[in-house]
Amino acid sequence: MKKIFTKTMFICGMMALSFSASNSFAQEANANQEQESAAAKNLVKWNVAAIALKTYSFQYERAVGKRMSVSLGFRMMPKSHVPFSSTFKSLIDDDQTWESIKDFKTGNFAITPEFRYYVGQSVFRGFYVAPFVRYSRYNVALPYNYEATFGTTTVKDRIDMDGNISTLTTGLLLGAQWKLSKAIYLDWWILGPNYGSASGSISGKKNLSNEEQQALREALTDLDDLPLVKTKSTVDANGAKIDFSGPWAGLRSGLSFGYRF
C-alpha cells in the first residue's frame, strides 16, 4: 500500500512539474511576443482598393505612444481619363459641356500627414480617429472642343489646354485596423471627409481670329457648370487661359494591407 501511495505521489509531482514548466514556457513565449510587438513601432501599408481608381497609394505609420501614432501617406495617379467617367458625366447637367470636356485627362499626387488615436487597448489595433491634412497637385490635359454660330456661319474647332491645380484640405478619418498575423495588418479607412481650397490654371496656345475668339469665349462659359470649383476664362489672339479657384471637397476611403517591423 505504501509503495502504491509513493508511486502515485511521484506521478502527481511529475505532472505538476510538467504543467508548471509548460505554463512557464507559454508565459515566457507570450511575454517575448509582446516585447517583440512593442519593439516593432513601424507599419508600411499599401492601399489595394485604390487600384480601382488607377491610383497607387502607400502609407507609413509609426507608434508614438500606447494608443497614438503618426503617419505619412503618398498617393500617385498617372495621367489618364477620369475613372468612372459616366458618374462624372451625370454630375454635369449639360450635354454640350460634356462634349466639350469628355476627352479630359488628369494625373495627380498627394501627401497626407496624419495623427491617429486608437480607442482600444493599444496602438495599431482597433478603431481609431485620425485628423489629417492633405496637399494634392493635379496635372490636367483638356482638349477643348467648341462651336458657335454667327448669323449663318458656324465655327467649330478645338484647342489643347494643359496646366496644374493645387488643393489643400483638412479632414477627419474614422477607421479600424486588425492584426492578421505576427506582422501582417489590415487597415480599413471607413470614412474620411475633407474640405479646403483649390487654385490653379490651364492654358492653350492657338492663333485665333476675332470670330474664333468670340466662339471660344462663349463656349468657355459652359465651364461654369463644373462642380466644386469656380472658373474664370481669358481669350485673346494667341490662345486661352482658364483660372480655377474656390472651395474643394474630398472623401478618403480605402483598404490597406500592412507589414509591421
Enumerate the language-model features and the residues they cover.
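Outer-membrane beta-barrel channels and translocator barrels
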Residues: 65-67, 77, 120-124, 179-181
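Transmembrane beta-strand segments that form the barrel wall of outer-membrane beta-barrel proteins
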Residues: 38-56, 69-77
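Ordered, amphipathic secondary-structure segments that act as subunit-interaction surfaces
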Residues: 121-141
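Extracellular/periplasm-exposed beta-strand and loop segments of Gram-negative cell-envelope proteins
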Residues: 35, 45-49, 79-110, 136-167, ...
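Residues on the lipid-exposed face of transmembrane beta-strands in outer-membrane beta-barrel proteins
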Residues: 58-62, 111-117, 131-135, 170-178, ...
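Residue-level detector of the transmembrane beta-barrel scaffold of outer-membrane proteins
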Residues: 43-45, 69-71, 128-130, 185-187, ...
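Cleavable N-terminal export/targeting peptides
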Residues: 1-37, 214-232
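Short N-terminal edge-element motif at the start of the domain
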Residues: 71, 75, 96-107, 114, ...
